[in-house]
Amino acid sequence: MSGLDSKNNLYLRVSTSNRKEVYKMSKRKLGILTFSDGRKQVHEELININQKFLNHLVKTLEKTRELELVVGSEIIYTPTQAKAQAEALKCAGVDGTLFNFSVWSFPHLAVIAAENGRGPYLLLSNLNPQSPGLIAMLAAAGCLDQVGIRHSRLWGDVSDEKVLKGILSFIHSASVVNRLKGQTCGLIGGRSMGMYIGAVDTRQWQTIFGVDLEHVDQLEIMVRAEKIPEEKIERALQWLTERVKKIDYSKEGLTPEKMKKQIRSYYATKEITEEKKLDFVGVKCQPELSDNYGTQCLSHAFLNDPYDMDGKKESIVAGCEADLDGALTMQILKLLTDSPVLFFDLRHYDTNNNLFVFSNCGSQPTYFAGRSDDPRENLKNVTFYSQTPFYYRAGGATVQYMCAPGEVTIARLARKDGEYWMAIIPGEFVSVPQERLKETSPEWPQGFTKLSIDANELIKGIGGNHVHAVYGNYVNELVEICNMIGINYKVFSGK
């Protein structure tokens, strides 16, 4: 399925499949405004009905324990109330606002609230055939369409699992859109190896996503790396040695000293993100660092991991080869799921087994090696091999493993004729014999992936070589995010 929405709206798409991953981030803040008839005497007669459905909505949402609710203090029936209540929710910092319709209401009230509140907006009509709530919602929706305010629509009893999931899907998507605004991406280096797909227009980023771009020279990594205390490096190397499956020093491209240099690079890059308050980064690496200092594979792995050699930490999105649209895609996935995100290439399609082979040139977060919050469970499946000297003269370790099996959502922001769109690809990582790793680049991390589409459709339609993945099914949320920010999308699925 595909969408071509710019200012037009699509109904909220709801998944009824059991989600394997759960939202683990801090509770999303959902604002709720309820609308009534603009005639005072009619409004007063409808207060009990409105309050009944509002109470049912609030109690049902509270039971999920996923949301912090900010409910308007009054049921809205005047323009003054609409403006004041919307502004109050905006000041409270809601991640999105639900417009609640149980009875007939004057539709201009919703427009006034939307003009003065904080979107994205979800219009909900409760299941109440005795009152024209659905009519009110559709009238309000039509008015919002006319003034160009994007919104989603949902109808039914909130006790219905589909409706409840629709509300949760909406607010999680809305929170991504709002939390992305005001963030800063650090571009460490510049465009890598002539890839247009990695370079961006800062004006376009700010206009569409609300994200700023801060440039940092790769020299910062090298200078800071040499200042990291030796004892810290030794402890980190010991920590890795005790936990990974193997560090293969059999080839000249990987030595203990080169491992230490990679560890230094990691700490230096982490220090840069903290000092400059960067929310996510892209590191060029190739060819300057990979030829003359050391590959940044270890940095990308452990920045994206929810832990490192010093313990648990927040995952910091890091895009390989300074792929900025890739890093932005990853940040969207991270904000949506609060989980590590993969960065890799579409390397090969196995026609005999109907498997796509996704691989990175040396680095992926180690979380995907075991899909565990315990680093030991993941790292026991990880081997550090020497990088390919043909491409990487400075050497260093690759972070090699096979992705643990499970349902995944793959995504990629791309541009066509300057216009952004998102590729959304539901899939599944599967386990195969370890010997299969040798069919491509055995020293690199790989994910063997089942997709429900024809290989030619994906290869002809995808907007670049890099894609990004998280465990779980988040197709509907990504579709909603695209609608909220006004970009096109295409879901590559045979279903």
Language model region names:
Residues 383-495:
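Extended hydrophobic packing segments that form well-structured cores
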